[in-house]
């Protein structure tokens, strides 16, 4: 009973902290002049990560198996994965451009996990015979970590598409304004020197602004590629370990049930992304579009089987088995 109570306390603490973190990040976005909020954002994510780690360890000790047997446990583990990616990205890149995505992903996973829909799964249960294997830790942890990494990388690609699309619209508007100014300049009389100077300053300011936008989009593309590359590696390991486990449990490496089918589709989509990203003949927009499609495919792969409640991977679905 003590472990269950402690589990509930850690769940509510982590969810409260991550909610405050999102609010702080929103304030920081709206009012960038407030410098002190950056430290509180990082401390909040680190505290949340420790709380979820403690929760998973307690549940592991209490249930005597890795807490990845149902949707509630996998969502909490995915939330832990988002916070872990946030911490490591902060270590690699001090600017931490992933903070919005990782913090938002963590709070949505926790919000759904602690909602009333999954109340029946909050209590630890004995594993079914097929899941009582040492491969559980290897296969499920790799798959969930790959989902977290691929979701982060895909969202960066979505952000890249949105920014590039907006930038193209702004360029068209500025070209129209520029042509109008040139036309006005040619048709009008000679203007004072101050106005010419002001015009040149505006041109240089726009060029400076576009250069920084270009740098930012390049960073988004770079980090999207690195994170998706990591997620693709983890996904490959997860699929291979799952195939070995399936052969031990059911006597076949692959059965084409809904989960396996969508996992293969996910793997194919991100393999296509890596191919287009490394192909010099294709611009970065092509790979970003592929990654954006992959974002939707991951959610179908992750929640699809749980919504259907069929197939060999239907353990821990919404309907009780």
Curated annotation (Swiss-Prot):
The organism of origin for this protein: Piper cenocladum
Transmembrane segments: 17-37, 41-61, 68-88, 143-163, 227-247, 260-277, 288-308
HAMAP family per the UniProt record, alphabetical: CytC_CcsA
Name of a matching Pfam family: Cytochrom_C_asm
Localization in the cell: Plastid, Chloroplast thylakoid membrane
Assembly mode: May interact with Ccs1.
Family of this protein: Belongs to the CcmF/CycK/Ccl1/NrfE/CcsA family.
Domain of life of the native organism: Eukaryota
Keyword Phosphoprotein in record: no
Gene Ontology BP, a term: cytochrome complex assembly
Keyword set, alphabetical order: Chloroplast, Cytochrome c-type biogenesis, Membrane, Plastid, Thylakoid, Transmembrane, Transmembrane helix
InterPro entries per record: Cyt_c_assembly (IPR002541), Cyt_c_biogenesis_CcsA (IPR017562), Cyt_c_biogenesis_CcsA/CcmC (IPR045062)
Entry membrane topology: Multi-pass membrane protein
Lineage per the UniProt record: Eukaryota, Viridiplantae, Streptophyta, Embryophyta, Tracheophyta
Job of this protein: Required during biogenesis of c-type cytochromes (cytochrome c6 and cytochrome f) at the step of heme attachment.
Major localization class: plastid
Protein name as annotated: Cytochrome c biogenesis protein CcsA
Keyword Metal-binding in annotation: no
MF annotations from Gene Ontology: heme binding
A GO term from the CC aspect: plasma membrane
């Amino acid at each position: 009973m003590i472990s269950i109570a402690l589990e509930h306390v850690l769940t509510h603490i982590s969810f409260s902290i991550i909610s405050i973190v999102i609010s702080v990040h929103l304030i920081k976005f709206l009012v960038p002049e407030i410098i002190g909020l950056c430290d509180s954002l990082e401390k909040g994510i680190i505290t949340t990560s420790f709380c979820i780690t403690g929760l998973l360890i307690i549940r592991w000790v209490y249930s005597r198996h890795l807490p990845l047997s149902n949707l509630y446990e996998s969502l909490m583990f995915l939330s832990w994965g988002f916070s872990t990616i946030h911490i490591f990205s902060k270590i690699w890149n001090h600017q931490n451009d992933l903070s919005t995505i990782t913090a938002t992903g963590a709070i949505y996973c926790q919000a759904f996990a602690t909602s009333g829909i999954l109340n029946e799964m909050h209590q630890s249960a004995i594993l079914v015979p097929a899941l009582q294997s040492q491969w559980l830790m290897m296969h499920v942890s790799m798959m969930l970590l790959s989902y977290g990494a691929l979701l982060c990388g895909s969202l960066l690609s979505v952000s890249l598409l949105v920014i590039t699309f907006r930038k193209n619209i702004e360029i068209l508007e500025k070209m129209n304004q520029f042509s109008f100014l040139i036309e006005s300049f040619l048709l009008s009389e000679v203007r004072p020197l101050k106005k010419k100077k002001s015009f040149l300053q505006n041109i240089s300011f726009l060029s400076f602004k576009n250069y920084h936008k270009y740098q930012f989009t390049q960073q988004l593309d770079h980090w999207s590629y690195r994170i998706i590359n990591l997620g693709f590696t983890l996904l490959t390991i997860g699929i291979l370990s799952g195939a070995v486990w399936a052969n031990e449990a059911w006597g076949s490496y692959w059965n084409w049930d809904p989960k396996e089918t969508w996992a293969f589709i996910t793997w194919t989509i991100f393999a296509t992304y890596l191919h287009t990203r490394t192909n010099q003949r294709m611009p970065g927009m092509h790979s970003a579009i592929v990654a954006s499609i992959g974002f939707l495919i991951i959610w179908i792969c992750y929640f699809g089987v749980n919504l259907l409640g069929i197939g060999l991977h239907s353990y821990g679905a919404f309907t009780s088995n």
